[in-house]
Design a protein with these regions (language model features):
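Core active-site phosphate/anionic-ligand binding loop and the adjoining beta-turn-alpha structural block
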Residues: 1-31
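Short helix-coil junctions and helix-kink-helix linkers
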Residues: 19-54
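C-terminal helical accessory/scaffold domains
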Residues: 4-7, 13, 17, 43-52, ...
Length: 169
């Protein structure tokens, strides 16, 4: 939804509810309502307008908390922010943008910047394997910026790999 707000396709909740009717999610909700927490399709709302409005409100609230959009609940308007544009263009998850928004400061050290980006949601499923620890230890000695954390933390592994990639060793 953030990308659609950035593109200008969506500027208010009414347009967002309408846009949602063109998605695969909507088709699946109609075909298999139980899977999406809809006990049965209400005869008074067969097109799930109420449910779509709930989803739009929840998504807009979440994006607003992450500072990716400005959401005026009373007027129903949605407006993109600089963070929303960045997230949309680079496919960054809202959880990562929220971490950046809350923790990125004007005068951070390189150590803290690498640590912050290594905490991105996109890297959360990267495992630490026992057979990698020796190699990571060798890398940690060669990276240009000191690494905070232990080799048992996925964020530390990501930090090391980011620096290794950037410094091309």
């Amino acid at each position: 939804m953030c990308a659609e707000i950035v593109l200008g396709t969506i500027s208010n909740t009414k347009e967002a509810v309408n846009w949602l009717s063109y998605t695969y999610l909507y088709v699946r909700m109609l075909r298999n309502p139980e899977l999406y927490g809809i006990s049965e399709i209400d005869k008074s709302d067969p097109m799930l307008v109420g449910r779509r409005h709930e989803l739009v409100h929840a998504a807009a609230t979440l994006l607003s908390r992450s500072n990716m959009v400005r959401y005026d609940k009373l007027a129903g308007t949605l407006q993109s922010t600089a963070l929303g544009k960045i997230a949309s263009h680079y496919y960054i998850k809202h959880q990562s943008m929220q971490v950046y928004s809350e923790n990125l400061k004007p005068h951070m050290s390189q150590i803290d910047i690498f640590r912050l980006f290594s905490l991105s949601k996109e890297f959360s499923l990267v495992p630490i394997r026992e057979n990698e620890k020796l190699e990571l230890q060798k890398f940690v000695e060669r990276v240009p910026v000191p690494v905070k954390g232990t080799l048992d933390e996925p964020a530390t592994k990501i930090n090391i790999l980011l620096q290794a990639y950037i410094s091309r060793f």
